[in-house]
């Protein structure tokens, strides 16, 4: 009797993808573990790479075919997800008025990227919104947990509020008018 052992099939047992850290970057990676089959395994990725693991990837879909010496195959597809673009939205801004010094404010919202966010204003503040501002230009440096960063500039203007002064410029010979139509 002759015993013929069938070779084990090629299997991809683990796929670990690391998404890109910042919008527009190419620092994603895919690590796989393949085994089985006969002889050495070869790797063919949809982006042309021929190694088991691939790196320096931008967002998108990547397909892999693993082939053994007998041309038996296993395949898998993995996605590197995009990261929303980091942005700053100005919600409201109040200019400084002459009625009260240092009463300007800037209220913003951070969007995109990967939170939590870090705020660094040119006046030393580290909060999302700032207040008690004098007329000046303020720069916000915003970064996310992956150290992706952007900056934006906001200007607080000085608004002169008219001051109403009431002066009585009429001379009534020391008397005030008592009734409409009277000539006192």
Q: Where is each model-derived feature located?
A:
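Proline- and Ser/Thr-rich low-complexity, intrinsically disordered segments
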Residues: 1-184
């Amino acid at each position: 009797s002759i015993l013929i052992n069938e070779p084990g099939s090629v299997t991809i047992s683990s796929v670990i993808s690391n998404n890109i850290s910042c919008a527009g970057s190419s620092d994603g990676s895919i690590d796989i573990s393949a085994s089985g089959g006969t002889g050495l395994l070869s790797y063919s990725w949809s982006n042309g790479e021929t190694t088991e693991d691939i790196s320096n990837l931008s967002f998108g879909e990547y397909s892999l075919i693993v082939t053994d010496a007998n041309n038996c195959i296993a395949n898998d597809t993995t996605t590197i997800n995009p990261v929303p673009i980091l942005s700053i939205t100005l919600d409201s801004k109040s200019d400084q008025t002459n009625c009260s010094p240092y009463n300007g404010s800037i209220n913003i919202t951070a969007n995109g990227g990967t939170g939590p966010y870090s705020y660094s204003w040119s006046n030393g503040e580290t909060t999302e919104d700032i207040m008690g501002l004098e007329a000046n230009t303020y720069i916000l440096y915003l970064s996310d947990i992956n150290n992706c960063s952007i900056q934006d500039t906001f200007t607080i203007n000085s608004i002169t509020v008219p001051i109403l002064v009431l002066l009585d410029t009429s001379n009534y010979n020391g008397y005030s008018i008592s009734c409409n139509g009277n000539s006192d």
